[in-house]
Amino acid sequence: MDFMEGLLTRRSVRKYDTSKKISKETIREIIKAAQYSPTAHNKQPWEFLVIDDREFLTNLRHIQRWTSFAKDADCVIIVCGDTEKSFSRSKEDESWSFIDVDCAIATQSLLLAAWSKGLGTCYCGAEPMQKVGACLKEHLNLPENIRPFAIVTMGYPAETPKQPEGRYKPEKIHWGCWENTDAPVETAAE
């Protein structure tokens, strides 16, 4: 699958084939791809926590209510950010930090890398839901400087996800100024 095909066909998967297991090597390759994501000032503040404990996956819904399907996933990857490594204006002003953006970019890379290997994923938020983040920190014994950003369920899809229609909307593209949604006319070079 080429990059554009993967980008345009990737979908959230919530039904997993419980008879198939993902190798640790495949998980490492997927996380390696995520670690090649760009970050502000190349700080690379992300950390990845892989959890395949059945009890945790089954009970995750008590921490983040929209993860009931995690019980059938092969694993979850908690994408975390290290606040001590994030680029920010100052150590005192975390409101101006790029940690969420850096973790979001890495999460998208992780989702696409998994899809390219025939795996399904579903991004489930942890940030900015403070209660979810606090519960994850407690249950997983995360250090004070580690913030859980995303919960990503992963496994082999039990079915082919339906492709939604109408995602591409040219009227959402503005050329040169907000009011202009007409694409510039391309002319052949003379």
Segments predicted by a language model, with ranges:
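Acidic, surface-exposed loops and disordered segments
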Residues: 1-190
